[in-house]
């Protein structure tokens, strides 16, 4: 029997062996605080690849040192960081998966001893520092940093690049009227608030012709914030610029209460897919193979991003295959142990 979850998916010239994506999740494990990959990262990502994930996405990787969430984040702001990332993508490829990287700038949510930077001098909450409002030169330099990071990603051997435009980090801060109070060409109207991301996408496209994803927060969960309908407009512009897939998350641009339940963000992937006619990824409390298969069968998304469930079990694809009754081909090293994986569920 055929299952969509385990069917190939092609984006441009990259074919994923299945629809299961390892969602980018910060590990805060660059122990020397220099942005470098460590042995932990090789094991962490290589294990998920061996577990038969179709696309392993490296966590939010800072395009500038001041763009880290913490001082133990991975970085891609210098050429000396390429080698470790290349080792990581090689590990991923050698274990049968494609490799992606999420390029990021934390903006006002950077928790470092140095200044944080944002579109406006508004802190995320009363616990965090007031950020420095970026001037136009700093905006230009940050756009350039994303472009250089994309070029380094290419040299590091990634197959897919994702821009982190969600969860209240810098790109998201420019998009949302809750965090962007500028009165110049980067603030005010939706077109102006989109300008920063537009310039980043244009800059990345100059050096990268592979698949390009953007992660969005499709709902600010605030009466004066953005909704999924606002993102229909934004993602329409992204599509015009050549973005291939929208990774649909939500929230975290301002403190908010969010009611979570299994698949609570799938509605956003479905809405964007239907109204913009662009490929989408569903993410958020997707924990079983049958749930993931139903999302695909209902045409609510094209890819399934799995986060915490892959932290709980790096062999989630095997568990999902067992549940669905699909015979998943194991790595040749493990073929002496065929059959179902037993679980406590």
Swiss-Prot record:
It holds the Pfam family Oxidored_FMN. Its cofactor is FMN. One of its GO terms (molecular function) is NADPH dehydrogenase activity. It comes from the Bacteria. Gene3D superfamilies: Aldolase class I. Coiled coil: none annotated. One of its GO terms (biological process) is response to toxic substance. It catalyses: A + NADPH + H(+) = AH2 + NADP(+). The keyword ATP-binding does not apply. It is an enzyme of class 1 (oxidoreductase). Keywords: Detoxification, Flavoprotein, FMN, NADP, Oxidoreductase. FMN binds at residues 23-26, 60, 102, 215, 307-308. InterPro entries: Aldolase_TIM, NADPH_DH_bac, OxRdtase_FMN_N, YqjM-like. Its EC number is 1.6.99.1. Substrate binds at residues 28, 164-167. HAMAP family: NamA (MF_01614). Homotetramer. PANTHER family: NADPH DEHYDROGENASE C23G7.10C-RELATED (PTHR43303:SF4). Catalyzes the reduction of the double bond of an array of alpha,beta-unsaturated aldehydes and ketones. It also reduces the nitro group of nitroester and nitroaromatic compounds. It could have a role in detoxification processes. Belongs to the NADH:flavin oxidoreductase/NADH oxidase family. NamA subfamily. This is NADPH dehydrogenase. It comes from Bacillus mycoides (strain KBAB4). The lineage of its organism: Bacteria, Bacillati, Bacillota, Bacilli, Bacillales.
């Amino acid at each position: 029997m055929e299952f969509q979850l385990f069917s190939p998916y092609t984006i441009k010239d990259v074919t994923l062996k299945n629809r299961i994506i390892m969602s980018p999740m910060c590990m805060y494990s660059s122990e020397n605080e220099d942005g470098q990959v460590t042995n932990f990262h090789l094991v962490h990502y290589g294990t998920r690849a061996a577990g038969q994930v179709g696309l392993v996405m490296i966590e939010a990787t800072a395009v500038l040192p001041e763009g880290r969430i913490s001082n133990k984040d991975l970085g891609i702001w210098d050429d000396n960081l390429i080698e470790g990332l290349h080792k990581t993508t090689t590990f991923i490829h050698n274990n049968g998966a494609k490799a992606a990287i999420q390029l990021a700038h934390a903006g006002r949510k950077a928790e470092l001893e140095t200044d944080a930077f944002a579109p406006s001098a508004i802190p995320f909450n009363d616990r965090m520092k007031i950020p420095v409002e970026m001037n136009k030169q700093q905006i230009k330099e940050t756009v350039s940093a994303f472009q250089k990071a994309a070029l380094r990603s290419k040299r590091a051997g990634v197959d897919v690049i994702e821009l982190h435009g969600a969860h209240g980090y810098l790109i998201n801060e420019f998009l949302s009227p809750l965090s962007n109070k500028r009165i110049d060409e980067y603030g005010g109207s939706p077109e102006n608030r989109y300008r920063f991301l537009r310039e980043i996408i244009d800059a990345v496209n100059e050096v990268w012709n592979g698949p390009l994803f953007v992660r969005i927060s499709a709902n600010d969960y605030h009466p004066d914030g953005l909704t999924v309908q606002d993102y229909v407009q934004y993602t329409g512009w992204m599509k015009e610029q050549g973005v291939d897939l929208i990774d649909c998350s939500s929230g975290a641009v301002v403190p908010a209460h969010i009611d979570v339940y299994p698949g609570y963000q799938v509605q956003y992937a479905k809405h964007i897919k239907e109204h913009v006619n662009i490929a989408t990824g569903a993410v958020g409390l997707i924990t079983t193979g049958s749930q993931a298969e139903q999302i695909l069968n209902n045409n609510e998304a094209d890819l399934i991003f799995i986060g915490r469930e892959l932290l709980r079990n790096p062999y989630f694809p095997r568990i999902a295959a067992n549940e669905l009754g699909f015979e998943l081909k194991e790595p040749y090293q493990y073929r002496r142990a065929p059959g179902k994986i037993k679980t406590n569920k």
